[in-house]
Amino acid sequence: RFKKIRRLGALPGLTSKRPRSGSDLKNQLRSGKRSQYRIRLEEKQKLRFHYGLTERQLLKYVHIAGKAKGSTGQILLQLLEMRLDNILFRLGMASTIPGARQLVNHRHILVNGRIVDIPSYRCKPRDIITTNNKQRSKALIQNFIASSPHQEELPNHLTIDPFQYKGLVNQIIDSKWIGLKIN
């Protein structure tokens, strides 16, 4: 994980750690001229590691985004940002995207009153995301929300009620709120 953030830069979804400033100097000395292939590969790897996707999942999202009207890159980022695991991370209900995936897989999360155990579930506007009524589920989410450093910088397309452990998807995400720098 740390080798990945040293090589690709900060990946907020993968870990809260940041690469040290000295590691950039080593990469610049080693790198030389970067080919177009290398630049595209690094950007693809950033997407994969940030969102926790396999190669096949990413290719499916690229295919869906290519068929849709509009900019393929923007639509791809919107599709990835509307995944349930990513929305939990953005709401502050999990510290990382892998942590959010675990919450979803362990059936702690309800979408519109139904248990969803698929992290790649595509949320739609006006979806209500809550925790299971079990005490363990509420305690887990409460700890994450209390320790969440980015509580005040919640994206416009999401709202959270920290006392009821409830999040709401208002609309599809605006491209300026995506925390990942993609070339």
Curated annotation (Swiss-Prot):
Molecular function, one GO term: structural constituent of ribosome
Subcellular location: Plastid, Chloroplast
GO biological process: ribosomal small subunit biogenesis; translation
Keywords in alphabetical order: Chloroplast, Plastid, Ribonucleoprotein, Ribosomal protein, RNA-binding, rRNA-binding
CDD domains reported for this sequence: S4
Limits of the S4 RNA-binding domain: 82-143
Domain of life, per lineage: Eukaryota
A Gene Ontology cellular-component term: small ribosomal subunit
Function: One of the primary rRNA binding proteins, it binds directly to 16S rRNA where it nucleates assembly of the body of the 30S subunit.
Subunit structure: Part of the 30S ribosomal subunit. Contacts protein S5. The interaction surface between S4 and S5 is involved in control of translational fidelity.
Family: Belongs to the universal ribosomal protein uS4 family.
NCBIfam families noted in UniProt: PRK05327.1, rpsD_bact
Record protein name field: Small ribosomal subunit protein uS4c
Organism: Crocosmia sp. (strain Porto Alegre 034)
